[in-house]
Amino acid sequence: MTRTPRIAYISTFVPKRCGLATYTHHLREAVLLAKGKRREGGFPAAVPPPDPVVCLCHAEETGQYSLPWQIPLVKQRREDYRAIAQRINASSVDVVSLQHEFGIFGGVAGEYVLELLRHLEKPVVTTFHTVFAQPSPPHTDVQREIAALSSHLLVMNRLAIDDLRGQLRVPAWKISYIPHGAPVPPQEDRTRKRREYGW
């Protein structure tokens, strides 16, 4: 039997109150379920879960990420980005899922993420959560290099495909559109909510 690929996620992550953190949490949970992991009490049954998350955070938040599969990355420590790349390279991770939003990474326009990408030896699939229709430096330069260093790009807005192709000259074969989606609440939550609203 062949094993399922191991994915390392790079993003903000819960308990941080951030849309990207919530998105990555739900994405990881859905992938674990698709890979056949059972949920118990809302958490994957595998201990520790196989897919690590590099959790972007501030120095004072690192203690929030203490589970064995959580790897805190202090966003303003440039040297830590290379160390994370080396750690992923030495692991059994097969692919990296980078969730990109300019504000979550350190440096000008989030440029520190480039330090990580330049040293990664694993394939990277980057989800661009923001693509500017009229990009300008330094955002253009950072996003162009991220695109060049990524094996594939995902966007959740069809218009972003044309923006990446036109402004950044990314080839069409390298970009895929996926709908953002939303988590499906458990049946008991739906039933309770319906009662609360008198349905």
Task: Place the predicted regions along the sequence by residue.
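Hydrophobic residues at beta-strand termini and immediately following loops
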Residues: I178
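Carbohydrate-associated surface elements
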Residues: L159, G181
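Phosphate- and divalent-cation-binding pockets in alpha/beta enzyme and binding domains
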Residues: D163-G166
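N-terminal subdomain of nucleotide-sugar transferases
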Residues: M1-I71, S91, S150
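Membrane-proximal helix-turn-helix segments that form the acceptor-binding/catalytic region
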Residues: E115-H119, P137-L153
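A short helix/loop element that forms part of the nucleotide-sugar donor recognition site in Leloir-type
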Residues: P186-W199
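Short N-terminal targeting/anchoring amphipathic segment
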Residues: I71-L73, I84-G110, V125-T127
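A short, histidine- and acid-enriched strand-loop-helix "catalytic/donor-clamping" loop
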Residues: E101-F105, K122-P138, H152
